[in-house]
């Protein structure tokens, strides 16, 4: 692929698709064939066409390839890959645990884990030690999701936990779609680590059954069990609730930690490069949260909803998610389907075809987001609600330099009924962590120093150190992660 001569060799496939579209001016929809590594796919690179795929009135189910990819980690019953009636029942079972009202009750626990994170940052500052932010942020977000979902404090920031270690090993062994998945040792290790996770969660479930729910707070598991017990006979969950719970609790540990940790890491990187944006964030925190940073944890504990009153911080998060979205949605054409691109002839996609909603490509299209590779949180300020032609409502913005994103162009958590179930939790969690760290610490992105120490990584990437003008370009590591985990120095502010 010619794009590989223009970009780092380890650039994430979704970012490669964006470069491919730019190089060859491929338009709103194009075909990509990497057989035998992956099925032939149709990449959607236009908001209107993406809406056609994600809308409720003409559902495009999740493609079976998702199950093939995630099965070693999430089993066969994950809400991420389920379709039709089974998906609806799973969604209704777990969605209440991700409601804003319930998540507000969990904010004090998020504060508690973030305080441990701050202690570790202080240690790195004292030692003036170079470290990679993403792995450390991932342990923070895994600890938070462990409490929210299971009621278990993994304490992985300060010790090794059996489930977390198995989980991290398993992530490294997931298929990558870029090499043939035929190594028997890899398959054995996947089963080994998956069994470790399954047995761990079963012990938690059985302990709850024997001793009752946690008296201090209700977890997502508690809410799901309560709802399951109210279901009538004939439920679709013929696999048995325990296995269903195991598969989906693993799913939430996987999906619930990743977006938050990568987004936090990318925000620290971007704010290090854009002090003018950081100054605006700090000004907002001073105004809304007060200037006594020593009291911030207790303030958020006492008033959890105050974390929702940070519009500029939220704009920074949204712009970061635009630049670095999670991998796009993989759907399957339920029948022969005709798409009508704006600037190309109609395309008929055969039944069963793989359709990839190219979120990265849409987010980096200058037609929808002028200067798409630049960081401008103002794109997402001054929100208002409009009613679309089909009756849906959507929050839109005044935009940056007068350019507001069109409807359906911004989709970091996807859109429609299959929108990420944990999107609200991710936004709350990220705001909590930023509120507790940005005024206490100064973060310095340190890619140049990291490359000096690790020239082998530069060589492996073909000697290229940037994509889209950015050192923290996305690479494939089970999901879309920032290059080298965002190497950083951190300093304690006086």
Swiss-Prot record:
Its EC number is 1.-.-.-. Belongs to the cytochrome P450 family. Induction: Expression is positively regulated by the acurin A cluster-specific transcription regulator acrR. It comes from Aspergillus aculeatus (strain ATCC 16872 / CBS 172.66 / WB 5094). The keyword Lyase does not apply. Keywords: Heme, Iron, Metal-binding, Monooxygenase, Oxidoreductase. Pathway: Secondary metabolite biosynthesis. This is Cytochrome P450 monooxygenase acrF. Transmembrane segments: none annotated. Cytochrome P450 monooxygenase; part of the cluster that mediates the biosynthesis of acurin A, a highly reduced polyketide coupled to a serine via a peptide bond. The activities of the highly reducing polyketide synthase acrA and the nonribosomal peptide synthetase acrB are collectively responsible for the synthesis of the acurin A core structure with a heptaketide backbone produced by acrA covalently fused to a L-serine by acrB. After the formation of the PK-NRP hybrid product, it is detached from acrB by reductive release to set up the formation of the lactam ring by aldol condensation. It is an enzyme of class 1 (oxidoreductase). InterPro entries: Cyt_P450, Cyt_P450_E_grp-IV, Cyt_P450_sf, Cytochrome_P450_monoxygenase. The gene is acrF. The lineage of its organism: Eukaryota, Fungi, Dikarya, Ascomycota, Pezizomycotina. PANTHER family: CYTOCHROME P450 (PTHR24305), P450, PUTATIVE (EUROFUNG)-RELATED (PTHR24305:SF107). Disruption phenotype: Abolishes the production of acurin A. GO terms for molecular function: heme binding; iron ion binding; monooxygenase activity; oxidoreductase activity, acting on paired donors, with incorporation or reduction of molecular oxygen. Pfam families: p450. Heme binds at residue 420. Its cofactor is heme.
